[in-house]
């Protein structure tokens, strides 16, 4: 705070986390704000400081200091970078454990140097120099149980934003290993499709390694087993997980967090609290500064692109679309796939775009299905409006 004064002044309203370097004086001064956490985390909160003086006719002025949590369940790291990130949740609360370790990665050499510093509430890892991909990193307690987990998303170039109708969207799906300004190349590569999320969860699932717009949909093929030959291979840490599992038990916040490689086919009502419509919920899987889009935001996007130079990339093995926007930039929309909620099997790889929204209606999710206006809020023929269905993830800026 740059205070200009020739008379006595004072600052009131300081708190234990929002202190000032000088609370009173008699001349112009630069007062520093001293912001700290409380040892439990950086929680969303605010403090109002009142600055008053003896100068006649000058009313006291108020300054509001807002502290926001920087916690996120996805950490974006550039290839070759060593990154330390706070062991905390999206609400800012620190989580405590005894060791950090990887659970699965898309490449055995993707992550190294994993370390947990309990005194600093910090996890450190190093990403390989010439690789892109994803890895799930977890903090474990003394008994080997998962306390919390984070997706470490390794990229060669940091994601940027594409603004559509006033809404800033990330230029790629969460977990995408490949992003190119050449839309045709991008949508034909399964590495651009990213990862897949059950509603209300932060733990992702891998997708397909085969794209086929003319197979693997109703009446045209037998669906392979949920995590069988059609699923992309990942590397599992055998000391931490038995690999992908299917469970008919009820999914709760505790079971989902404690079993990050288990696909649940039944969900509890409590999972509706995992994501927040229009905000960043506790299990929001987007990086810092981003959140899961609402159904209304999907509708806005679809309405805009349908009237602004939409181009359908209907060649090869996908029906993916890409859009050269009149406002500038290119929005690439892979026709991803989804994992069916009652068995985890892959449906429509390369045929239909299927993405998460944070909106629930009647207790059921409203996913975006296909790149056509109207499909984000209507229940289409093949809609899977189940909490357990896993869709792709494209984030919007908070």
Predicted regions and their residues:
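A short glycine-rich, aromatic-capped structural motif
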Residues: 159-268, 296
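Low-complexity, Pro/Thr/Ser/Gly/Ala-rich linker/spacer regions in secreted
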Residues: 55-73, 157-160
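C-terminal, surface-exposed recognition/capping segments
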Residues: 174-176, 256-398
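GGW-centered surface loops in extracellular recognition modules
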Residues: 71-96, 139, 144-193
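Short, surface-exposed loop/turn segments at beta-strand-coil junctions that are enriched for proline
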Residues: 36-42, 128-130
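Surface-exposed binding patches on compact interaction domains or structured appendages
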Residues: 5-32, 70-124
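A short beta-strand micro-motif common to beta-rich folds, especially ectodomain repeats
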Residues: 43-55, 131-142
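Short, exposed coil/turn segments at beta-strand boundaries within extracellular/luminal domains
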Residues: 41, 53-62, 143-148
């Amino acid at each position: 705070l740059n205070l200009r004064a020739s008379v006595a002044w004072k600052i009131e309203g300081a708190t234990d986390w929002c202190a000032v370097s000088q609370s009173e004086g008699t001349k112009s001064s630069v007062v520093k704000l001293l912001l700290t956490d409380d040892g439990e985390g950086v929680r969303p909160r605010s403090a109002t400081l009142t600055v008053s003086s003896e100068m006649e006719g000058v009313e006291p002025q108020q300054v509001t200091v807002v502290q926001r949590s920087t916690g996120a369940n996805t950490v974006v790291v550039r290839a070759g970078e060593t990154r330390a990130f706070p062991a905390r949740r999206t609400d800012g609360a620190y989580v405590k454990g005894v060791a950090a370790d990887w659970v699965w990665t898309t490449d055995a050499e993707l992550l190294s140097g994993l370390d947990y510093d309990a005194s600093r509430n910090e996890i450190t890892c190093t990403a390989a120099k010439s690789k892109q991909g994803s890895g799930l990193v977890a903090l474990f307690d003394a008994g080997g149980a998962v306390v919390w987990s984070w997706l470490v998303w390794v990229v060669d170039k940091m994601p940027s934003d594409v603004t559509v109708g006033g809404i800033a969207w990330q230029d790629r799906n969460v977990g995408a290993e490949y992003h190119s300004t050449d839309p045709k190349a991008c949508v034909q590569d399964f590495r651009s499709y990213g990862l897949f999320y059950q509603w209300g969860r932060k733990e992702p699932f891998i997708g397909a390694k085969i794209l086929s717009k003319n197979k693997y949909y109703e009446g045209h093929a037998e669906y392979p087993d949920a995590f069988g030959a059609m699923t992309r291979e990942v590397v599992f840490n055998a000391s931490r997980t038995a690999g992908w599992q299917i469970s008919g038990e009820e999914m709760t916040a505790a079971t989902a967090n404690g079993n990050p490689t288990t696909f649940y086919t039944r969900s509890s009502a409590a999972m509706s609290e995992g994501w927040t419509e229009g905000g960043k919920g506790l299990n929001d899987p987007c990086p810092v500064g981003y959140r899961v889009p609402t159904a209304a935001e999907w509708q806005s996007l679809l309405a805009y692109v349908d009237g602004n130079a939409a181009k359908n990339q209907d060649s090869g093995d996908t029906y993916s679309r890409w859009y050269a926007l009149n406002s500038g930039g290119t929005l690439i929309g892979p026709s991803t796939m989804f994992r069916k909620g009652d068995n985890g099997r892959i449906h429509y790889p390369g045929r239909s775009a299927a993405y998460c929204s944070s909106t629930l209606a009647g207790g059921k999710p409203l996913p975006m299905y296909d790149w056509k206006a109207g499909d984000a809020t209507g229940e289409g023929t093949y809609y899977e409006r189940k909490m357990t269905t896993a869709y792709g993830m494209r984030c919007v800026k908070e």
